[in-house]
UniProtKB/Swiss-Prot annotation:
The gene is mug154. This is Meiotically up-regulated gene 154 protein. It holds the Pfam family DUF2418. Has a role in meiosis. InterPro entries: Nur1/Mug154 (IPR018819).
């Protein structure tokens, strides 16, 4: 008898269609390399949206003819001269563009954040940023003097950030009300490009600072860390199986120790409620534990020839 496969019913497919489509859109959104796309298409796309929105508003306003009701009242009344479906469609499309502008601004400024957690430190530690907040934790052996802090860092998408600069809500509202004024339109575009220029310069400043910090850490590792940790050592084996008078000493080729790491877990950090149990620090393994250092069988080491020396008692 063949394998029975339970197929999804048509009702379940119809019910799950919206959430499945939403998950598919989210996966496609995450699969896009936005760093490459933003450098090439963000500014042309934003300018195209501005141009289309401006043309729609000009067409909608040009279909209104202001006339005066009489000589007594100077109020003006707009009479629609074109009630076609095309004008209604353009009005709906311009409202959608305005809604997208507000939605993009709110999403790129409020919901694009990354969370980082610090090691347990003193509760009285003062922070220089308001984005650092203490994290509630459950710990059986909590001494009450240490606290884990969480840092929320703004990490905007570059494509959405450029789009927010060139098609911000203020920019869209100005084009909505003053689309027929050439002077106001040019000043609006000038202001948007000025904002984009400052944002790009500030992003470049952050990249330069990150590069400078990496170079400082690299220089520190090269000058202080590596010379003290990666010290060249040699293995020495002493054979005393025939007595102390006939002991022999064998020297091996000097080499650097193999770096291995151990997971170090903090008791207060393991009991956090919002994250699973993950290692928060790595501790360098002592070079005396040679039986765990992963020495290959063909390496120049005495433990390949003398297995009883694997306890590390004869290492010098």
């Amino acid at each position: 008898m063949g394998k029975l496969i339970r197929r999804t019913s048509l009702t379940s497919k119809i019910i799950n269609l919206p959430i499945d489509y939403f998950i598919y859109v989210c996966e496609q959104f995450d699969s896009v390399e936005w760093d490459k796309v933003s450098d090439r298409y963000s500014i042309p796309f934003s300018l195209a949206v501005n141009f289309i929105f401006l043309l729609m508003r000009i067409y909608i306003k040009s279909t209104h003819v202001p006339v005066q009701r009489n000589q007594l009242f100077v109020d003006k009344q707009s009479i629609n001269t074109s009630r076609s479906w095309f004008r209604a469609f353009l009005s709906f499309l311009s409202i959608c563009f305005l809604f997208i502008s507000f939605l993009n601004f709110i999403f790129s400024t409020r919901f694009q954040n990354k969370l980082y957690r610090t090691l347990p430190q003193d509760k009285r530690t003062t922070t220089s940023t308001p984005n650092v907040k203490p994290v509630f934790q459950h710990s059986n052996n909590d001494d009450g003097d240490e606290q884990v802090f969480e840092l929320k860092v703004w990490s905007p998408n570059q494509f959405l950030l450029n789009f927010a600069c060139l098609f911000s809500p203020a920019h869209a509202l100005i084009l909505w009300f003053y689309s027929t004024s050439l002077r106001v339109t040019l000043l609006t575009f000038l202001l948007s490009f000025t904002t984009l220029h400052f944002v790009n310069k500030f992003s470049l400043l952050l990249k330069d600072q990150q590069y400078l910090h990496r170079q400082v850490f690299f220089e520190y590792d090269k000058k202080f860390v590596e010379p003290r940790l990666s010290v060249v050592k040699r293995d020495v084996a002493i054979n005393t199986t025939r007595g102390p008078t006939t002991a022999s000493i064998e020297y091996f080729t000097p080499r650097k120790p193999i770096d291995t790491f151990l997971e170090h877990r903090s008791s207060s950090h393991d009991h956090l409620t919002s994250t699973p149990r993950t290692p928060i620090a790595l501790q360098r393994r002592s070079v005396h534990h040679l039986h765990d250092s992963g020495i290959s069988r063909d390496s120049s080491s005495p433990f390949k020839r003398f297995p009883h020396l694997s306890d590390g008692s004869s290492r010098f």
